[in-house]
Structure formats: C-alpha cells, structure tokens
Curated annotation (Swiss-Prot):
InterPro entries linked: F-box-like_dom_sf, F-box_AtFBL13-like, F-box_dom, FBD, FBL13/AtMIF1-like, LRR_dom_sf, LRR_PRU1-like
Protein name: Putative FBD-associated F-box protein At5g56400
Start and end residues of each FBD domain: 372-421
Domain F-box: 32-81
Entry-linked SMART domains: FBD, FBOX
Sequence intervals crossing the membrane: none
Provenance organism: Arabidopsis thaliana
Organism placement in taxonomy: Eukaryota, Viridiplantae, Streptophyta, Embryophyta, Tracheophyta
Family matches, as PROSITE patterns: FBOX
Amino acid sequence: MNLIRFLLVFQGKIQMNESRKKLNCQSRQFNVDKISDLPEDLLVHILSLLPTTNDIVATSGVSKRWESLWTKVHKLRFNDRIYDGKRYDSFLHFVEKSLILHKAPTLVSLRLSVGPKCTADDIGLWIKLALDRNICELIIKHYPDHGHIRLSRRLCDSKTLVSLKLKNAILGAIWLPTCFISLKTLHLRYVKYSGDESVRTLISSCPSLRNLVVKRHNEDNVKRFAIIVRYLQSLTVYLSPLHGVADSDAYVINTPNLKYLNIKDHYTDLCSFEDMPYLDEANLDVAFTHTENFFESLTSVKKLSLCLKKSNAQYPEGIIFSQLDHLELCTCDDSKWLNILAMLLPDSPKLRVLKLNDKNHDFVDKYCSCTWNQQPSYVPECLTKSLEIFEWRNYKATFRERDVAVYILKNSTCLKKTVISPKLKISGEICDHHIIREDLASLFMGSSSCELKFD
C-alpha cells in the first residue's frame, strides 16, 4: 500500500477493492495536495501508523511540507533485518540521526529489533538519546538465535519511562533502590540475570509497577525467583520447556494488590504466596509439590483455571471460594483433577460456569475400569442453586469421566446449557462419537430446561 492510498483509507475516502486500486497521476497529485491541507497533528498521527521509521522518513520527499514532518512522529521503530551485512553501518547511522533529529516534546515509544551486529555500546547510545527525549516506552528485542545482548546501566537514569519490554537481554546487578520511579509495565522475556538477588533488586526498584510479564528459560541464573511488589495488579510467569529443565527451586510472590495471576511452569517445585485479597482471575498450569499455600491465597478469585498434572493438590478444610463464578479444570490426569473437582464443588457456593478440558492430550488407558470414588458426600450447593453452564472439551468417555458427567447432569438443577465435545482419538484410535453421544443423551438431567449440545 503506497502512502497516498494509506492516507486516503485512513480518512475513509476510498474503499479497498479491486475496482479502485489504480489512481492516475493527476488524481494522485490532487490527493497529495488535499492531504497536505490536513492539520499537522493529524498528519503526524497518520505517519505514526506506518510500519517502520524507514517508511516514515521516506515520506519526506512527498512535498515541501512533508520534509520535516517525520521528525515530529512520537513513535519510532527500527529493525536491522532490512539491512544486509554490508550496509549495517548505514543502519547504525540512521537510528542515531533519527533520534538526534527527533523534535516531538516526548518520545512516546522506541522499538529496537536488532541482531548480532548490534553492540551494547550501540544500544547504550540510543538509550541515552531516547532518555534525553523523555521516552515513555522502550522495547528492545534481540534475535533469539544470536544469544543475548548486555544492556547499559543508563536505563537507570530514566525518570519518564512507563513501559520497558526486553527480550534476550542480559541484566547485571546495576539497579538502584528506586531505579524506575515511573515504570508501570515491565516485560522480561528470556532475560539473563546475575543471580537471585539481581531479580529481587530489579523488581523492587519499580515502586509504581502494575503489570509484570516474565518468560524464563533454563539459563537465566535464577533459582529462587522473588516477586515482591506492593501495587502490582497483573502478573504473568512462564517457564519455557524448549531448552530443557530449568534449575529453578521456588517462586516467592508477595503482591497484596494483585488482580490477575497467570503461571505456567512444569518444573519449579515450590511457590510461596502471600495473601491476595483482590485477586479476580488466576490461571495456574504448574507442578508445585505442595499446593496448600497457594489455594489459601486464591479464596477471593472469581475466575479460576487449573492444570495441576504433577501436583498433589490439597488445601486445608474450612477454605471457601465464596466469589468463584467460573472454574476451568484440565482433565489430563484423572488421579489429580478428579480430586480437585471433588474438593472445589462443595467449597464454591456461587459457581456458575464449569469447564473441563484435556489441554495436554495425554495418553489414556481406555480399558481402565476405575470409577470416580471421590464424589462429595452431599450434593454441593452450587449444583442446586447456581451452576448454569457446563462445558466439556476432549471428553474421553472413560468410566471415571462418565461418572462425573452422570453426577453433574443429574444433580445440577439450574443448568441452562451443556456442551460436550468428545475427543477425536484415544490412544491413537478414532473415537466412535455416535456411541458416545447416544450414551450421554440418554442420561437423566436434573434440569428440565437444560440445552444439551455436542460439538
């Protein structure tokens, strides 16, 4: 899409269809003049929507008015992949010159995507120039197949940085007690640290932090990952299995104002949680050996998704999930999820939505005759008063799973909608969906108004 078409589409003046793809030279010149009459703020905003700063700078030749417009664009994006090795010096010069000539009062965003030819000194210079222009968001991505790039301590000089997103970077022990006083969003993807203490110091040096995303790998040099942030509201932690098992022992999470929690980690054994009274949503796909502590921290949650394949899931008696409205359980391991379901149903009096799904698609012994012997001793309150939606994806029709389906459909007197999707294959063999559907359709349902569907 050329610039003229881009600008016209933005204004809503033309439709993107085959019949109007060609513009003659006269109409193009007319459109350029017409667009040039737009207010400068609007033109600058339109330019900021172009993919890269190279594209933005290229518009300087459109007309005299456009010569310096690009210097006022508040978002800059650089990617060295568009330069071959022989022209890499041109890329370095282009980035430096673009930052030096930048005239907007605030540099809202700087995105750098760089590879092995880019050095720590190059990054350091660009960071310094960006800090001089009151940068708000900094994104640095280093190509994953070329190792990591060490970042300069100049980052600590920022007073205006609100969002920092790093990928494949090395962070040393360079952080001050209040390094990022304005930072609210921090993304650390496949970052190397100097040790446990560097993580604790880095995160605690962000007193205003609200959103933290951590994607780890097995070479991040951290065993005990501590996240202690008073005002944090959203936390996502992911440990990548791509490079083997990480040498990770535990998480320490102290975030009393957290509202959203998402952890996927099949290797770390322990997690220490402090109370999270404002937590609304939690997604946990973990292998923690002991779960008592984190269940105690989830009592205020409204939406809960659990996959505890390797965990011996237990929590103390007396815990009530009084706000739980939406529960999703992964059914990848019968011996684990059935126990969790039997515990949570009686302790979730307001549960309205129950979803079951085999997310990991593990091997299933379809000839196993084991039944569900962990049913609650009484019909849970949620089944008779609140449960309205029941969905089961990848239903395997084992004896245990059929017992669960029978129990829920029989005792749920408020159900409005039930959707069951049989698994396509079990242990490599195609399932007979017709037989499964006939069996489920014949079951007694406690709710006469429930709509039963099969996907």
